[in-house]
């Protein structure tokens, strides 16, 4: 029987696996640069963790959660996002005693309709910085995100920001928003009619609803927030300008999870390859999330990104591997053993692909493996010395390499000089 992958999943190979590795490495490099510590959490968690952090009425919990009952009658969920598991691990293991900046990367799961840049199993990365928030911590996260995308040579995006206040400050606004949207309930999509009862904010940045005139004319949250809250937002905008970071304020940007407070942001692609789903990464501040999970009453800020969406916009031509392909082969077992020893002695200094069987010299030069190589290492026929030839396949320039004491610097120099 021939099996196929499940709907909403994908296999990564060749170009896709190269892109995965490039994005992951770029993210890890940026995280280390900004002094974030890697945190790995289990793929499975208690369902209640996500209900507590995302809200019982969130789309994530109501519609997208992969959950099941295990043999011990526990309600288990495949993690749909990384913030809640990361904060759970921080609290459970008392990690704040040693550090307060963490990052994660791995597979997540959401039961939703697969589309370009969105899968049911997907790779996601993110960061969490637990510290009292200020415009300077906010802008530092923007620096991190920009550095990450710059490393990937992605520059066709815009930074969209908003200020949504604390949950208590939003109550009055939510009442006005619901009253306003109730007038247009018959014009809302079915999912938005449900949101209107318990999660009206989500209607504002829904990709379909946000295009409707009555949604564009909805009350704006800034008209309902206290002056001192907005002053922080204005100060943050001034910092953006002082650092010459272009941005756009979108009063309807709210992000998809209920725990956000004050500053929220998205890096939105202007690349036409992405279709409707254009957010490359997004995040914001949360004020009481750590306390909700039994930790200290400390604010935090973070962002998350989906690997699949970024894969759609990076260009592999910007990440060409300049390493030359070197293939070693032998016509007898003794020579093969000598070549394998030579290859192992080089370690990571020089990459050599060794054909692990005795070959016929006349036939091997016609093989695909040799045709795709830049340099060849082999022992010349009838050569009784402890030496092999390193040969440029294109110009016939040759370097004799001593098998007993190979001069690695000479080999590297030869490869460099004969690589043009």
From Swiss-Prot:
Keywords assigned: Aminoacyl-tRNA synthetase, ATP-binding, Cytoplasm, Ligase, Nucleotide-binding, Protein biosynthesis
GO molecular function, one term: ATP binding
Keyword Ligase in record: yes
Xref: Pfam families: tRNA-synt_His
InterPro entries: aa-tRNA-synth_II/BPL/LPL, His-tRNA-ligase, HisRS-like_core, HisRS/HisZ
Predominant location category: cytoplasm
Family label: Belongs to the class-II aminoacyl-tRNA synthetase family.
Designated name of the protein: Histidine--tRNA ligase
Organism of this sequence: Mycoplasmopsis pulmonis (strain UAB CTIP)
């Amino acid at each position: 029987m021939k099996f196929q992958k499940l709907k909403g999943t994908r296999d990564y190979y060749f170009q896709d696996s190269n892109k995965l590795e490039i994005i992951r490495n770029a993210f890890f490099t940026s995280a280390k640069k900004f002094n974030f510590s890697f945190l790995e959490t289990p793929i499975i968690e208690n369902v209640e963790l996500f209900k507590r952090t995302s809200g019982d009425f969130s789309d994530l919990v109501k519609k997208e959660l992969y959950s099941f009952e295990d043999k011990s009658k526990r309600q288990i969920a495949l993690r749909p996002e990384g913030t809640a598991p990361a904060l759970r691990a921080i609290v459970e293991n008392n990690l704040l005693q040693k550090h307060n900046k963490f990052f994660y990367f791995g597979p997540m799961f959401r039961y939703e309709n697969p589309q370009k840049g969105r899968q049911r199993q997907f790779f996601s990365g993110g960061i969490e910085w637990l510290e009292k928030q200020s415009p300077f911590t906010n802008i530092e996260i923007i620096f991190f995100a920009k550095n990450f995308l710059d490393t990937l040579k992605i520059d066709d995006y815009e930074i969209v920001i908003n200020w949504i206040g604390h949950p208590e400050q939003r109550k009055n606004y939510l009442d006005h928003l619901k009253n306003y949207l109730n007038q247009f309930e018959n014009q809302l999509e079915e999912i938005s009619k449900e949101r209107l009862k318990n999660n009206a904010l989500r209607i504002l940045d829904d990709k379909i609803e946000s295009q409707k005139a009555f949604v564009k004319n909805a009350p704006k949250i800034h008209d309902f927030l206290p002056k001192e809250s907005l002053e922080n937002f204005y100060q943050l905008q001034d910092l953006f300008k002082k650092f010459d970071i272009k941005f756009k304020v979108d009063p309807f940007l709210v992000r998809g999870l209920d725990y956000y407070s004050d500053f929220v942001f998205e890096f939105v692609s202007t690349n036409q390859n992405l279709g409707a789903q254009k957010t490359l990464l997004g995040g914001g501040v949360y004020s009481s999330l750590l306390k909700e999970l039994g930790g200290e009453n400390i604010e935090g800020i973070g962002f998350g990104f989906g690997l699949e969406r970024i894969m759609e916009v990076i260009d592999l031509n910007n990440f060409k591997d300049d390493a030359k392909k070197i293939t070693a082969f032998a016509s007898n077992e003794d020579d093969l053993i000598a070549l394998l020893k030579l290859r192992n002695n080089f370690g990571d200094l020089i990459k050599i692909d060794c054909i692990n069987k005795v070959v016929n010299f006349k036939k091997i030069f016609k093989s695909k493996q040799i045709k795709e190589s830049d340099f060849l290492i082999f022992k010349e026929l009838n050569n009784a010395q402890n030496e092999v030839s390193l040969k440029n396949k294109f110009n016939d320039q040759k370097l004799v390499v001593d098998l007993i004491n190979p001069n690695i610097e000479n080999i590297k120099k030869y490869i460099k000089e004969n690589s043009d």
